[in-house]
């Protein structure tokens, strides 16, 4: 399985993202979900998710939080980080999220949009914080799969409205059945597909190529 970046960065990445959320929430007073959104819209999440050394190892957790706040709110916090020995639930949430993003190579914005919100992650703390992180991965996958099944992608919605099966769409468009399934489940990003692939799927469905793209 292809991961998001080299595993040698992983321990630092997990600790730093955990410290980032801990500092932002418990020292600076930000709402966990709100700060997760700031992390994404700031662009820091994109760089972090690609394993940019500046972000996964070069900045501490509080420094990451400061960068996020600076980019989104045009200010920097002056609150010093606390020196608590015990790890908070927010630390665990960020730590686990970093591992999940690395393991699946999904973008942070896709993870959140697919239902794995910070609220959902924090709700798992009581039962999973002492478990192996692989258990978190399993539960997180279930949450995302259920969310995607409930909501559906644009491709899935348009295909069903047309009355076409996945197999038929594969035959008509030339796209593999597996890729169509992955696009519908949002386990592959249709926005990143080759333009010719999207055009062929759109023609088979009788829609515009842009109708198949997902909002960010």
Model-predicted regions and their roles:
Residues 25, 159, 170, 202:
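The alpha-helix within a helix-turn-helix
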Residues 155, 169-170, 180-184, 212:
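Conserved hydrophobic/aromatic packing and binding residues within compact polymer-binding modules
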Residues 175-191:
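Recognition helix of helix-turn-helix/homeodomain-like DNA-binding domains
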Residues 65-73, 194-211:
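DNA major-groove recognition helix of helix-turn-helix/homeodomain DNA-binding modules
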